[in-house]
């Protein structure tokens, strides 16, 4: 059996991996090796490894590498520690392929570790662009370290090929997270309210905002200005915590302070978990922030999205997304909630959807001879 080592560091990643993990675990030709790290093991971010275990997956190794600090060096230190710890894990597991997704700093550490140990890498969600985040450089770096690529759109497939990757090893699979959404057992409003001990108002937004790591000095002022604009609207908001990138803790501090001043109108939660997150997204009138979930997943629910700033700049999105800068936030929220725009969103399909996404990935993991030997492909 071909041993596939899946390494995941955060909840959003796990949502992408989930349908793939299920099929690897039941395959007669693949053996699942599961390694969790970083935010999954952090109290601050909800100890989400427990959800993975609850879902029935055996975790082979836990890599406790997150150095939580406001210092700009915390992510590089966390990545370095991940490499040290993962080196021993990969020696122990001896995987045939390391399967990674996306563009997190801990994913870069995992890719660097596997590459230096001559272990082939399969990468999901390469070729995408997010100009306002250092993730953009991380993602392209992982692409060059990987041997086989599963992209979410044809445009991203072409970009990976443009980066010198052999077309026969670049497969457009669609976004696997959408499978997770379509198979979610959605939770009722009543149960959600009981779970979070907060009454959901008739018109509310789901807000997720992460640091713009390419310009970290602006994060504090940005979140203060954003919250000031939101206060001037009439909507209620459920705020989810920012991630562990530099500046995330400062964003979370201001979110908590803001919510504490009007707890009937606003609610803050560190980690909703996948089922609750998607269930609340389904109920919400509007998605606000700068998370990829607004670009990729929200279209499954035909929801209007107000995408703030440059963090997702360059990423392909549907017509349900309104891009705005902070001064135009209120105007964009009003447009997103207008009857014409809401009705337009209801007619749209998700450009990232492929009903066979996880099957495509599994088929190629089984049938492709994945080697670390690569030649640059010239256009």
Language-model-derived ranges and their functions:
Residues 52, 187-283:
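Donor-nucleotide binding loops and adjacent catalytic segments primarily
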Residues 299-344:
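Nucleotide-sugar donor-binding patch of glycosyltransferase catalytic domains
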Residues 7, 41-43, 145-221, 373:
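A nucleotide-sugar donor-handling region in carbohydrate enzymes
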Residues 7-8, 14-25, 65-167:
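Active-site and donor-binding regions of nucleotide-sugar-utilizing enzymes
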